[in-house]
Amino acid sequence: YTDVDGVYTTDPRLLPEARKVSQISYDEMLELASLGAGVLHSRSVEFAKRYNVPIHVRHSFSDQTGTRVAADPETSNQAVGGAALIKNEALVTVKGVPDRPGTSLAIFSEIAQEHITVDMIIQNVGADGRANISFTVLDDDLATTRGAIERALVELGSGHIESSTDVAKISVVGLGMAEQTGVADRMFRTLASAGINILMITTSEIKISVLVDREQAQEALRTIHAAFELDKAPTTTVLSETERRRDS
């Protein structure tokens, strides 16, 4: 039991049309938890997944049906089950560092010593044997991150730092991505149609994240949520393993 009545397709405080889902998979819930969904702690979801124990998320003071967290997603024919927005991101770019083995190690080992989590990472090869490395950290870690990079640049002998806190990360999550094509195309096309530029992209088997300007983040979340019809209940739902055995 919690102070919310279930798991939603996105944060209902950000998007009123967010829909409470009847069921969500362990893996989807873990991804959403890593993206800031505070409904369940990731450790509890990992424990439930390990022993295949369903979790029922519901409000402490309500009899309303909540959300079941289990092995299966809400539906098998929907590629995306949820979306998330993180606004407290900072973009860091280290420009003009030597394009040679050990450069990334020098930078990220200094950052790791500060116990800072690095998120999205892109490296581009520049001119004259130089490279540019971009990545994101949390806003609160930016000053410490810059200090760590400065130490690495002394060792590397060249390079300078640029940073911005005017960015936000939008992510879509869904087990169906592993089997359905066109998710990235729909997401990127939706953002382009809304005039929203993508600064960085990262993907996993069940997640796509993009970095956008913070002032466009709310509109990006709204258009993506609508493009994947997350406000609409699925026409078919997946039966749990227990229900399948009972019906067979």
For the regions a language model picked out, list residue spans one by one.
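C-terminal catalytic "cap/lid" subdomain
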Residues: 1-248
